[in-house]
Amino acid sequence: MLETKDLNLFLGNKHVLKNISLSIPVRGEIIGIMGPNGAGKSSLIKSLIGEFNATGTKLLYNKPIQQQLQHITYIPQKAHIDLDFPISVEQVILSGCYKEIGWFRRPNKSARDKLKQLLSDLELETLRHRQISELSGGQLQRVLVARALMSESEVYFLDEPFVGIDFSSEKLIMTKIENLKQQGKLILIIHHDLSKAKQYFDRIILLNQTLRYFGDSEEATSVTRLNETFMSSTDCSDPSQRSNITC
């Protein structure tokens, strides 16, 4: 179980996340995180993985999430990647297995076999020796996904994986995400394209500083729910406004 209770985050004087409480079983499921710009979507993920110092309870498998990071893989927005760093596609992907084999060990046969399969599945074979600075947006995103899949995690966080990429790359990436779901993994994806929300996600978290809704993707994309999320703001100093949704 992935759980938060009364999660609050301040960045400077801004109250970015207000009293977020969630309870999500770790099972084969793809969950979207959606809301307007500045709603706190990326901040929620960064709070969960410890990049931001949010207050409140954060648990994975009934233990503090900071003690369980070996079970989590995070794929940041590709815009945050340093493209000037001299590293090849193959080296980036192989770095995904270092938390399991150690930073100073050569990848074993199992890792090499997995690399070969991922290069094939994500159509990166001809790019394996390219520098990441030479890649298109879609190619780079496929590399980041391949890197994430080198590790055996239970929970995957993806921050806007489909922004600025071609349809072919999006389709390849979504196929791998569906495969993770079939393996019983929990995948949470920050996403902005409402037209594909019902197609991609089993359930959706609607966020705008507070938790506006968490549940069925059909209901989440209804006019009523979207208006509540995208067109309003709530003063959550009032305890009655606290979000506490368990599914």
Regions found by a protein language model. Give the residues of each.
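Conserved ABC ATPase "signature" region
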Residues: 109-127
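Catalytic Walker B motif of ABC-type/P-loop ATPase nucleotide-binding domains
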Residues: 156-159
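Helix N-cap at the start of a conserved alpha-helix in ABC-type nucleotide-binding domains
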Residues: 167-169
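H-loop/switch region of ABC-family ATPase nucleotide-binding domains
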Residues: 191-192
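H-loop (His-switch) and adjacent beta-strand-loop-beta switch element
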Residues: 204-217
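ABC ATPase nucleotide-binding domains
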Residues: 218-247
